[in-house]
Amino acid sequence: MDKRYKIKQAIVHITYTCEHHCPMCYANAGIRKEEPSLEYLCKVIDRLLELDIKDITLVGGDPAIYTHIVELVVHAKKNGAMLSILSNTLEFNGKREDVLDFIDVYEGTIHHSDPGKHDSFCKVEGAYDKLINNLKFFSDRGKSVGVALNMIPYNYNVLADSVESIIEKGIKIDHIIMQRIIQFGRATGMNNFEISSEMLGEVLRQVESLENKYGIKVIFEDPLPFCAIDKKYYKYMHPCEWGISKISVDYKGNLSRCGADVFHSFGSVFDDVDYLWTTDDNIKAFREKKYLPVKCHECSLFFKCGGGCPISRNPEHGFTADYLSKSGKII
């Protein structure tokens, strides 16, 4: 396999069940509600480890409410996985103590600095307080804690406040994960979760402030095109890693280039993954980036930028230029 395309991290959707009802959730309500067996999920994890993919992040739905979450993380860790988990609750069915030695990184999604507005967004009363309590539990015990922030019109101007309010509660935040919402799942056909260039500028100012003030690591999960941002923010960006070094796996072992891109599924973790990873037509099309404008390919920063998110407009319609792209015009 070409070393440029070695899979280094797997994001595993172990369940699509969640007690929250966020309006833009990718795990769309009403579908895929069955709960996978522990035995089968262990086989999926074992296969990833066999492929030398040890960096594994458990997601959902809400992976922390999966019935057998304790047994699963114990199995994964004992067999060599480096485990992270991204959850709306970090509840672990009341068994937080039981997972302490087996999960390396604990991440929670915060929707707003105002607890009431967070709860209103996910339609669960007390959701904010529950998550904060659990983040503090793991932080107090020296575990790595991160916060995922969705950049949307609902909260773009209070993202720094959202993080600082957590820090003020005595929680040490190691990193923040910045994400955009695309037209997928419950958000299909809706653009009201997309941010404007002006909103993006405000987000980046807040991100830089948090980094400078607290030394927090900033991770942009779906990077932005360089032509959409000021040069001083290039340091946060990178070409999209999904389809390069990151892969998405569902609880049945099905593979897709990206967790928000199930329209580009390409086989099973139990197949010859190395072969699929280098020969699948959709993955090759993503890497070649012929879907981007000529101006992007001619840009001197093209290989550092990568064009942003290839499915930011609508994954069902295939790869396109990022909706924030100015087609190679550098700010």
What is each PLM-predicted segment?
Residues 36, 82, 102-105, 109-111, ...:
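Radical SAM enzyme [4Fe-4S]-AdoMet core and its adjacent flexible, acidic
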Residues 63, 90-92, 151, 181, ...:
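Hydrophobic pocket-lining residues within nucleotide cofactor-binding pockets
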Residues 11, 15, 19, 237, ...:
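Residues immediately within or flanking Cys/His clusters that coordinate Zn2+
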Residues 17, 21, 25-28, 243, ...:
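Cys/His-rich metal-chelating microdomains
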Residues 1-98, 102:
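Conserved alpha-helical substructure of the radical SAM core
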Residues 29, 60, 110, 180, ...:
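Residues that line or immediately flank small-molecule/substrate-binding pockets and catalytic motifs
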Residues 1, 6, 255, 259-331:
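Flexible mid-to-C-terminal extensions adjoining Fe-S/redox cofactors in radical SAM and related proteins
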Residues 38-42, 66, 92-94, 115, ...:
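Structural motif corresponding to alpha-helix initiation and N-cap regions
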